[in-house]
Amino acid sequence: MLNIFSLIWICLNSALYSSGFFFGKLPEAYAFLNPIIDFMPVIPVFFFLLAFVWQAAVSFR
């Protein structure tokens, strides 16, 4: 179980800290989308957490 949490932590850190390294700057016409694009790497984590909430709702059948 510790390995799963370590992997999640590594993925979150790499998504948060290396986003400036892998991606360039948006063109000026799309500058208003910067807050949304900064948030996008975290969205798959919400789907992962939603799976646990869903399973808890159906009593982990």
From Swiss-Prot:
Keywords: Chloroplast, Membrane, Photosynthesis, Photosystem II, Plastid, Reaction center, Thylakoid, Transmembrane, Transmembrane helix. GO terms for cellular component: chloroplast thylakoid membrane; photosystem II reaction center. Pfam families: PsbK. The chain crosses the membrane at residues 36-56. HAMAP family: PSII_PsbK (MF_00441). GO terms for biological process: photosynthesis. It comes from Coffea arabica (Arabian coffee). It is a single-pass membrane protein. PSII is composed of 1 copy each of membrane proteins PsbA, PsbB, PsbC, PsbD, PsbE, PsbF, PsbH, PsbI, PsbJ, PsbK, PsbL, PsbM, PsbT, PsbX, PsbY, PsbZ, Psb30/Ycf12, at least 3 peripheral proteins of the oxygen-evolving complex and a large number of cofactors. It forms dimeric complexes. This is Photosystem II reaction center protein K. Residues 1-24 form a propeptide. Its main location: plastid. One of the components of the core complex of photosystem II (PSII). PSII is a light-driven water:plastoquinone oxidoreductase that uses light energy to abstract electrons from H(2)O, generating O(2) and a proton gradient subsequently used for ATP formation. It consists of a core antenna complex that captures photons, and an electron transfer chain that converts photonic excitation into a charge separation. It is found in: Plastid, Chloroplast thylakoid membrane. It comes from the Eukaryota. Belongs to the PsbK family. SUPFAM superfamilies: Photosystem II reaction center protein K, PsbK (SSF161037).
